[in-house]
């Protein structure tokens, strides 16, 4: 895995995966798309879609645990704080040889810079929330969310996917 290349690719994902508008009905449709995709693959994950301050969709699939819900919360907090994907922030910390606690004073009990939470961005408004998955390895959590967003927004996932490691 090439961290610099992944960070560049994640930046392209974040720029491309922007909704023209977003409302609770769109959150429900996206959440159900993610649920169906995860179910078809046998993923034991938790899925969470929020605008900052308001939950819009949550599902814990068979095999997901309360620990997944806590990972969702902590990853979501990273997106809320930095307005970037949790995986990008984690890779930046890895690149710098630092932690969120060291560099930003953010406690590990509340913030997790692991892959799986992606900014929910609306054209003309910016980042308004997050879409999060937890239960797979962090890179797979991140890519699961990106794949679902590509399908929802009509983008070719093969073009935006991270390079295979």
Curated annotation (Swiss-Prot):
Q: Name one Pfam family in it.
A: HbpS-like
Q: InterPro entries in the record, alphabetically? A: PduO/GlcC-like, PduO/GlcC-like_sf, YBR137W-like
Source organism superkingdom: Bacteria
Official protein name in the record: UPF0303 protein Bcep18194_A4700
Entry similarity comment: Belongs to the UPF0303 family.
Q: Which organism is it from?
A: Burkholderia lata (strain ATCC 17760 / DSM 23089 / LMG 22485 / NCIMB 9086 / R18194 / 383)
């Amino acid at each position: 895995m090439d961290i610099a290349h992944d960070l560049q690719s994640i930046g392209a994902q974040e720029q491309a995966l922007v909704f023209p508008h977003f409302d609770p009905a769109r959150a429900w449709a996206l959440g159900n798309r993610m649920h169906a995709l995860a179910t078809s693959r046998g993923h034991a994950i938790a899925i969470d879609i929020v605008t900052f301050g308001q939950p819009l969709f949550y599902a814990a699939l068979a095999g997901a645990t309360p620990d997944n819900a806590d990972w969702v919360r902590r990853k979501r907090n990273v997106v809320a704080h930095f307005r970037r994907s949790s995986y990008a922030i984690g890779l930046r910390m890895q690149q710098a040889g630092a932690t969120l606690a060291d560099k930003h004073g953010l406690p590990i009990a509340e913030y997790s810079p692991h892959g799986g939470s992606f900014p929910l961005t609306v054209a003309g408004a910016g980042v308004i929330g997050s879409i999060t998955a937890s239960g797979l390895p962090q890179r797979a959590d991140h890519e699961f969310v990106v794949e679902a967003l590509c399908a929802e927004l009509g983008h070719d996932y093969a073009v935006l996917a991270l390079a295979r490691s």
